[in-house]
Amino acid sequence: MTSLIRLYVTDKLTSGIEVELTEKQHHYLVHVMRRELGDEIVLFNGRDGEWRGKLKILLKKSGRIIILDQLREQKLEADLWLVFAMLKRGPIDFVTEKASELGVSKLCPVITGRTNSTKVNLDRLKTIAMEAAEQCGRLTVPGICEPQRLEQVLSNWPEGRGLVLLDESGAGKPIAEVMADRSYRNGDAICIGPEGGFESTELEYMKNLSFVTSASIGRRLLRAET
């Protein structure tokens, strides 16, 4: 049995309505996946749960899916942010894809003293996040923030949201202990540094903030995207 393709759409989803395919979605379904009129597709929009639909109209560059019935109700997902230093194209694409698959709700790229790239194509990252959500089965697509300097992000940090700093110096408690002590507070964030690590002044600045908790991931030095 052929597995059903999942597509993210922005339309409201309810039984009986028809959803217009974008040109890109049409190309993917018809020319890449070889779907035909009458084939079933799964749709989600991050608000109304997951729905089963059927290809009702297929034209040269457009098409429509009629919504049949709901497969899953929308449920509250973990609200975990990932604050990470900007990376080059390949690594930042990898981070976006894997963080989306793991359920991160928002990705916040930041510019640090040792950041080796300050340019990013946000539209490309949003597409990667959307495709990862479609593939992995989650019901939402994570948000992606405009890159800002680390200090800007932290100076406007939302009240009540904790930040777990992955400290490559090994000064913090093991991350397993930190997360156990916090009983995983929904509404936290994790902060990852750049290649070469945070500068000493950046570490000192962050550790003096009341909402920051340092955590160690062990003695091994990992790649920034890992």
Where are each of the predicted segments found?
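RNA substrate-binding interface of SAM-dependent RNA methyltransferases
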Residues: 72-165
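A C-terminal functional module that forms or caps the active site or interfaces directly
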Residues: 188-205
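Structured adenosyl-cofactor binding patch, chiefly the S-adenosyl-L-methionine
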Residues: 200-226
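N-terminal positively charged helical leader segments and presequences
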Residues: 1-73, 123
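Residue-level preference for the first positions of well-ordered beta-strands
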Residues: 162-163, 185-191
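Short, ordered loop/turn segments at secondary-structure junctions
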Residues: 12, 70, 112-115, 219
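Short amphipathic alpha-helix with an adjacent loop that forms part of the alpha/beta core around
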Residues: 153-159, 176-183
